[in-house]
């Protein structure tokens, strides 16, 4: 049995403002996500992403999110933005994802009928080189919609992040129910797409820490 750590990792995704990234770093967030998927309301240009990248504190991961982007686009981001992780939300296959010599996470949509057929063995066969998985409600992410957490594959030995409609109000229950390696939030800490709310960011981190305290010490 895979025993999870007591400290749940936190990723704030869809970051578009330097001030929000600085606050995330101050709050001890483990990773910030920068979106390069065409059509996203949180889409960044490479130059804007580079400006944000320069403000990220040491030991905070920078995750570059793609969805069916071309290899040239991804190579440009890898070379200029220097992400520490890549995150793929499209139809990318393992061979493509590992082309860029950067560890990658694969997002798995969980809200549709396809989710009923997802099993651990299938994930490992399709993405044997994935550093971990992100279970989200929909493929594109950032929808603010949850999914049935009981659909999560069992016996996962790779780290996984829970996403999809996670908010300061439900993240405590989400961690208690699924015991994830980490949680991934975007719309749940926003005033509007790409514009984060400092109070919600703080509350989210506080609720994650409270959930971890309960798991470790049995206190609410």
Swiss-Prot record:
Presence of the UniProt keyword Signal in the record: no
Organism listed in the record: Xylella fastidiosa (strain M12)
GO MF annotation: an example: phosphoribosylanthranilate isomerase activity
CDD domains linked: PRAI
Pathway the protein acts in: Amino-acid biosynthesis; L-tryptophan biosynthesis; L-tryptophan from chorismate: step 3/5
A Pfam family it matches: PRAI
Keyword match Amino-acid biosynthesis: yes
GO BP annotation list: L-tryptophan biosynthetic process
HAMAP family for the chain: PRAI
Reaction(s) the record says it catalyses: N-(5-phospho-beta-D-ribosyl)anthranilate = 1-(2-carboxyphenylamino)-1-deoxy-D-ribulose 5-phosphate
InterPro entries per the UniProt record, alphabetical: Aldolase_TIM (IPR013785), PRAI_dom (IPR001240), RibuloseP-bd_barrel (IPR011060), TrpF_fam (IPR044643)
Keywords, sorted A to Z: Amino-acid biosynthesis, Aromatic amino acid biosynthesis, Isomerase, Tryptophan biosynthesis
Lineage, highest ranks first: Bacteria, Pseudomonadati, Pseudomonadota, Gammaproteobacteria, Lysobacterales
Protein name: N-(5'-phosphoribosyl)anthranilate isomerase
Family: Belongs to the TrpF family.
UniProt-listed Enzyme Commission number(s): 5.3.1.24
């Amino acid at each position: 049995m895979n025993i999870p750590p007591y400290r749940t990792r936190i990723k704030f995704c869809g970051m578009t403002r330097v001030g929000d990234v600085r606050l995330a770093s101050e709050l001890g967030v483990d990773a910030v996500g920068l979106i390069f998927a065409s059509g996203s309301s949180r889409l960044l240009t490479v130059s804007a992403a580079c400006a944000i990248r320069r403000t990220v504190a040491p030991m905070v991961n920078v995750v570059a999110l793609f969805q069916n982007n071309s290899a040239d686009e991804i190579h440009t981001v890898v070379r200029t933005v220097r992400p520490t992780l890549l995150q793929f939300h499209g139809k990318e296959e393992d061979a493509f994802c590992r082309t860029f010599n950067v560890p990658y996470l694969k997002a798995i949509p969980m809200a549709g009928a396809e989710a009923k057929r997802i099993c651990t063995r299938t994930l490992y066969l399709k993405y044997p080189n994935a550093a971990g998985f992100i279970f989200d409600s929909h493929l594109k992410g950032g929808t603010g919609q949850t999914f049935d957490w009981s659909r999560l594959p069992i016996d996962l030995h790779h780290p996984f992040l829970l996403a999809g409609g996670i908010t300061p109000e439900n993240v405590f229950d989400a961690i208690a129910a699924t015991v994830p390696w980490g949680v991934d939030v975007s719309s749940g800490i926003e005033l509007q797409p790409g514009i984060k709310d400092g109070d919600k960011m703080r509350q989210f981190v506080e609720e994650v820490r409270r959930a971890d305290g309960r798991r470790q010490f049995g206190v609410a």
